[in-house]
Amino acid sequence: MKEEEFPKKIADNVTMHSSNPILYVVDNFLSNDECDAFIEAGKGRLKPSTVISPDKHIQHKSRTSENCWIQHDASEILHEVSKRFSILVQMPIRNAEQYQLVYYKEGAEYKPHFDSFDFNSEDGKKNWEPGGQRLITALAYLNNVEAGGGTGFPELGVTISPRKGDVVIFHNALLNSESSLHAEINPRSLHGGMPVIKGEKWVVNLWFRENLRY
């Protein structure tokens, strides 16, 4: 059986980059006004980004950005965007965490990591509880970056270049693991925010969980 070749267009504005894990980019999913609305909703509230440690969230040299959390209905425009994200990934918006707005200044990055949780670790179990595993990541680029700042998937040999309005969708977990009752990390979903070489980068993350969050 012939292996699938990537990237490949699956719609006029959708490019598939992998089937394991599912990874695709939707061009111009967000309008300029919608991108700007996310940034305006979070400006003035940004704090240094953290990573998960066994007991708490801590700052770490592997993640040098700033972020804040934004509610799905923080404004009418974001409420409508939330509906579209739900339709895009075919999951209820109530399964999703709040939006995470992230700002990368020149030189900032987020080294390769997993979005899903390791249930074999104490911190993984703790973060798993409110909603279950992170199944799907929606990552939207809110501005054009002058140089650098791509999203790299080292296990796939894929780098997605940031372009304002584009959304990257990828699946994080193995749903049919025979060795566990829980959806486990797909090791091929390893990814990172590459260093911003020139300019700045604004993105928003939306993580969809197994179960309802509210």
What are these regions (language model features)?
Residues 1-214:
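Fe(II)/2-oxoglutarate oxygenase catalytic core
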